[in-house]
Amino acid sequence: MHIDTTRFGRVLIQESDLVRLPEGLVGFRSFTQFVLIPDPVMAGLSWLQSATAPELAFGLVAPPLALGDYRVELRPGDRAALELDDERSALIYVILNRAEGGLTVNLQGPLVFNPPRRLGRQMVLTSSRFAVRYPLDGPAILPGPTAFRATA
């Protein structure tokens, strides 16, 4: 199947490449079908591209390496929604934003994916410990996807 994108043109994907976010994203609840596309230029950057809206794509990176203590707590309802049997198989991404003064990531709204089930969910963290606009120091801080780390 093909999807049209404004960033990459027409992209050939397999149906199995689709990732469902049944609840959508904050501000974009009606969009639930996406595909993860690795950036062809910058390693560690991926795009969460809507399968139905060509103009809707979000840059995703793993939480910055500088935040070794970054934790996402999954409650039982989160695990059920993601059909997650083993939290170690989950991946965490954060949304990249361009702001005055450089790039930032949203640490309060991470995305958690269950790759085997092709399911994702945006979490909304209630702790004020992490910023909505956490500044990145540069492209060297863009690692690949992060394995899930649970907290009690």
Indicate where each model-derived feature is located.
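Short beta-strand-centered segments at strand-helix junctions
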Residues: 70-77
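Long, compositionally biased stretches
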Residues: 1-68, 87-152
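A short glycine-leucine-enriched loop at secondary-structure breakpoints
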Residues: 82-85
